[in-house]
Amino acid sequence: MALNLEKKQEIIKAFATKENDTGSCEVQVALLNERIKLLTEHLKANPKDHSSRLGLLELVAQRRNLLKYIKRTDHARYVVLIEKLGIKDR
């Protein structure tokens, strides 16, 4: 269920702004997005798993806060990121 190392490295490589960039907002949002997708699939198969549902809500809130920060600081970066991830603009 968790992201394996290879998948994580692919995401980091795709969204990094420079080499060895693992902590930029874009990378963090992309990793959170992938974890959210995995948890959503898990919850479809296990609808009574309430602890995972709470974890999913926390991840969504964390992603929302990071996206809000990016939108506030650099709107062009925000637009590119949500297009790459396929997230709707609120």
From Swiss-Prot:
Key word Acetylation present: no
This protein's GO CC annotations: cytosolic small ribosomal subunit
Gene3D superfamilies in the cross-refs: 6.10.250.3130, S15/NS1, RNA-binding
Subunit structure: Part of the 30S ribosomal subunit. Forms a bridge to the 50S subunit in the 70S ribosome, contacting the 23S rRNA.
Entry-linked HAMAP family: Ribosomal_uS15_B
The family this protein is said to belong to: Belongs to the universal ribosomal protein uS15 family.
Protein name as catalogued: Small ribosomal subunit protein uS15
Organism: Helicobacter acinonychis (strain Sheeba)
